């Protein structure tokens, strides 16, 4: 269960206006910035989080979702049904999908208790448009590390990198 919760938590970290400060052309820097900002807020804002667990949704919305390509990820979930949906149905779906991500990641982040993370060393990007980045979550209480492999995609419209998929081991 811990792995599952950390998996969801780090998708939020991957990935998601916080993204504007980092180098948008480097997914490794974006990954590091998202993780650092999220973990810093989790550490520093525990009183607010304990008083109102829904506050985690705010952290997710502000620190993680700017790094996530929500529409692309949501379209992948819809699969073949994406093309048959009307624009109004798509808009409603993406709004609901975004709220789902905030809720799911917020619940996962509620499990934060001093974990640290390590991001894999940067690799040359070349002409790649999809890049895997491994993040390892280290628990101070000696639990086995959790490996998270994020897929970052170069947005074909903006040229910026955003996370859209994650696998946990």
Residues of each region from the PLM?
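Early exported N-terminus immediately downstream of N-terminal targeting peptides
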Residues: 24-105
């Amino acid at each position: 269960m811990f792995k599952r919760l950390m998996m969801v938590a780090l998708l939020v970290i991957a990935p998601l206006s916080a993204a504007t400060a980092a180098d948008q052309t480097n997914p490794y820097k974006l990954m590091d910035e998202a993780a650092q900002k999220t973990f810093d807020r989790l550490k520093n804002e525990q009183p607010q989080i304990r008083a109102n667990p829904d506050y985690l949704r705010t952290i997710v919305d502000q620190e993680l979702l700017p790094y996530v390509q929500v529409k692309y990820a949501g379209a992948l979930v819809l699969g073949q049904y994406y093309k048959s949906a009307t624009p109004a149905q798509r808009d409603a779906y993406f709004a609901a999908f975004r709220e789902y991500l905030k809720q799911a990641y917020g619940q996962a982040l509620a499990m934060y208790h001093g974990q640290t993370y390590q991001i894999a060393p940067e690799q040359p990007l070349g002409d790649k448009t999809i890049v895997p980045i491994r993040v390892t979550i280290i628990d101070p209480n000696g639990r086995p590390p959790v490996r998270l492999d994020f897929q970052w995609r170069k947005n074909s419209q903006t040229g910026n990198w955003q996370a859209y998929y994650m696998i946990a081991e």
